[in-house]
Amino acid sequence: MKTQPSEESASPAPVNPGNSGNSGNRRASSTRISFSDQLDGGDSGDSSSNESERLMESDDEGNIQIPVPTGQPRGRMGRRFTLNPLIFAKEEREARRQSLAQLKLSYYPKHMNPEHYDTGLGFCGWFLMGLSWIMVISTFPVSIYFCMKVVQEYERAVIFRLGRLIGGGAKGPGIFFVLPCIESYTKVDLRTVSFSVPPQEILTKDSVTTSVDAVIYYRISNATVSVANVENAHHSTRLLAQTTLRNMLGTRSLSEILSDRETLAASMQTILDEATESWGIKVERVEIKDVRLPIQLQRAMAAEAEATREARAKVIAAEGEQKASRALRDAASVIAQSPAALQLRYLQTLNSVAAEKNSTIIFPLPMELVRHLIN
């Protein structure tokens, strides 16, 4: 059973009394929420109803202002319903504060500490900036020649102000402005760069010494990180490529190095790409160029290959003789069963002999006479 609440319990107390003067500039929509409390304070036989109303105001931007209800709620359910809006409002403010912090961090490049950025110049910094602007204005238009810089389409400029990175990331392509004396910049080339890894002496898994060289193709993917996180990104990438080539091929056998070059190149590319990601570098391709073996090992491998070829030739010759013997056996069994076939074979042999020597005269004899003479 619902009962009408009293005026004392229905009148809300606004949270922000200081904003009452701006009520004329804000269109407020009010929603009246009523609920009943069918539970008592702990008595099982006594049933009483408690109803309270709150006025919730929302402005044009959708921000909800929850007033604090007046009146003393009865029972546990009444107290819980009264405190829930305040708890939800506090949680909403905390969630909004965390989302704003995450949004701020999302503007920083990956693998970059936000402390590196110019979050506050201080009094000295603002003073020096003011002096710099005064110098630019007083020497105008000559100062434009020193302050206006241009970067190409394939370049980016990383600007430092009093030793700190300025917000907004790298500048370019196009024109950008640099304050004299307090700002400096570094140009970064974003085009793909290739270099050859010098031949590396490697001891393979099967204890064979070999020399291997490779070619690496990479580019700078994040100009700000490549300048702030590593002193010389190109030199560091070259050294890392040499050590990675030695370490990776040292775990493989010589046969794997000679036969699986593409697989080894893909594995090396993955390792280098993961290692240089924090430097703002993207490894695009790796190619193993040449594998050099010692002279003694080359001679031994050549002798082994020659012996393998000779053994294979002997096996092929033996298999041919075996097949020929089987064919002769089959032919003999056929000739034994048909005397006419033997006579035809005899005449064919005589024809072959007569074709080689034209001066030879051959008189063919019947096979019965030949058998009689033989017996």
From Swiss-Prot:
Keywords: Membrane, Transmembrane, Transmembrane helix. Its main location: membrane. It is found in: Membrane. InterPro entries: Band-7_stomatin-like, Band_7, Band_7/SPFH_dom_sf, Band_7/stomatin-like_CS, Stomatin_HflK_fam. The chain crosses the membrane at residues 120-140. Residues 1-75 are annotated as: Disordered. It comes from the Eukaryota. Residues 11-50 have a biased composition (Low complexity). It is a single-pass membrane protein. One of its GO terms (cellular component) is plasma membrane. Pfam families: Band_7 (PF01145). May be involved in cilia-related function. Belongs to the band 7/mec-2 family. This is Stomatin-2. It comes from Caenorhabditis elegans. The gene is sto-2.
